[in-house]
Curated annotation (Swiss-Prot):
Annotated glycosylation sites: N25, N96
Coiled-coil intervals: 71-109
Signal peptide: 1-20
InterPro entries membership: CLE45-like
Name of the protein in question: CLAVATA3/ESR (CLE)-related protein 45
Disordered as annotated region, ranges: 87-124
A single GO molecular function term of this UniProt record: receptor serine/threonine kinase binding
Family statement: Belongs to the CLV3/ESR signal peptide family.
GO CC, any one term: apoplast
Organism: Arabidopsis thaliana
Length: 124
């Protein structure tokens, strides 16, 4: 009678044997070694013998033109910003808000002690 760990190891060995017959149609990863599909190997210009020895997939695909174009499309380009202009707009908005203090929805509360809530309790 086989134990559960022995059965699982046997199952894994059978699966690996099945994958070995068809290894270029299956992508698998073991100890950070990449087994790439045959089509990916052709794209990268890598010999099929070298596929199992790759340590990083990024190394092979890093410098292709397609990847550079894709990076350029995804890169966000920001305009130059004039900080003085933005500060002037912010101060103008603040001035507009302070001029209209009676129409604002916020209530103003005086600083200092609150006489209503700080009353002495008569029977404490």
């Amino acid at each position: 009678m086989l134990g559960s760990s022995t059965r699982s190891m046997f199952f894994l060995l059978v699966c690996i044997g099945l994958l070995a017959d068809n290894r270029y149609n299956v992508s698998a990863m073991r100890h950070r070694e990449f087994f790439l599909k045959e089509t990916q190997a052709e794209k990268a210009g890598v010999q099929t013998e070298e596929i199992s020895k790759l340590r990083s997939i990024g190394v092979q695909f890093k410098h292709t033109l397609e990847d550079q174009e894709m990076l350029n499309k995804n890169r966000r380009v920001l305009e130059e910003v004039n900080k003085d202009k933005i500060k002037a707009e912010e101060t103008q908005e603040r001035k507009n808000k302070t001029e209209d203090s009676f129409k604002s929805s916020k209530r103003r509360v005086r600083r200092g002690s609150d006489p209503i809530h700080n009353k002495a309790q008569p029977f404490s």
